[in-house]
Amino acid sequence: MGFYMLLTVALLLTSLMNVEATPVDQAERSALEKSGLGNRIQPRYDNCGDAEADCYQSKCMDGETYDEECEASCNYVVANCI
């Protein structure tokens, strides 16, 4: 059992040592973000705090008092802040 643990650790360390990290300059990073490759982190917009406050207020949580203002702020939160 100990032999297999040692073998697993040795293989993991060997595989980690073979990974080469190359630096990416800002131009390449921008091109990757525009092309959609990889995971993009969406920017958090300035209006998110206000829109979230409007969307999560009590009148927007109640189906009877939910209005167009609630819908607009909640749609903004879903599209731009989450």
Curated annotation (Swiss-Prot):
Broad class of the protein's primary localization: secreted
Keyword Signal belongs to the record: yes
Domain notes: The cysteine framework is IX (C-C-C-C-C-C).
Subcellular location: Secreted
Keywords: Disulfide bond, Neurotoxin, Secreted, Signal, Toxin
GO CC terms in record: extracellular region
Leader sequence segment: 1-21
Organism from which the protein derives: Gemmula speciosa (Splendid gem-turris)
Disulfide bond annotation, renumbered to this chain: 48-70, 55-74, 60-81
Keyword hit for Magnesium: no
Protein name: Turripeptide IX-04
Propeptide, residue positions: 22-39
One annotated GO molecular function: toxin activity
